[in-house]
Swiss-Prot record:
Keywords: Ribonucleoprotein, Ribosomal protein, RNA-binding, rRNA-binding
Subunit structure: Part of the 30S ribosomal subunit.
Name by which UniProt lists this protein: Small ribosomal subunit protein uS17
A GO CC term assigned to this protein in UniProt: cytosolic small ribosomal subunit
NCBIfam families assigned: PRK05610.1 (NF004123), uS17_bact (TIGR03635)
Highest taxon, organism lineage: Bacteria
Source organism per UniProt: Pseudomonas putida (strain GB-1)
Summary of the function given for this chain in its UniProt record: One of the primary rRNA binding proteins, it binds specifically to the 5'-end of 16S ribosomal RNA.
Length: 88
């Protein structure tokens, strides 16, 4: 019996917290059209992602993928850091 290949969900967002060990909080922003007025509104979602080597810092632009549940609220994993935050 052949199993269907499952597509891997990937998202891109900004790191807003790196205070936890091996975990980052990523803010995902998307634009949604308002059903009545037609204006595009920003909507956002915060996701916890696994960062095995603690390489991410606040402000980094990262790519994450869905994975099996790793904790109560963590079911995403870091794929790569797309852009480093500018240090002041």
């Amino acid at each position: 019996m052949a199993e269907a290949e499952k597509t891997v969900r990937t998202l891109t967002g900004r790191v807003v917290s790196d205070k936890m060990d091996k975990t980052i909080t990523v803010l995902i922003e998307r634009r949604v059209k308002h059903p009545i007025y037609g204006k595009y509104v920003k909507r956002s979602t915060k996701l916890h992602a696994h960062d095995e080597s603690n390489q991410c810092k606040i402000g980094d632009k990262v790519s994450i993928r869905e994975t099996r549940p790793l904790a109560k609220t963590k079911s995403w994993a870091l794929v790569e850091v797309l852009e480093r935050a500018v240090e002041v």
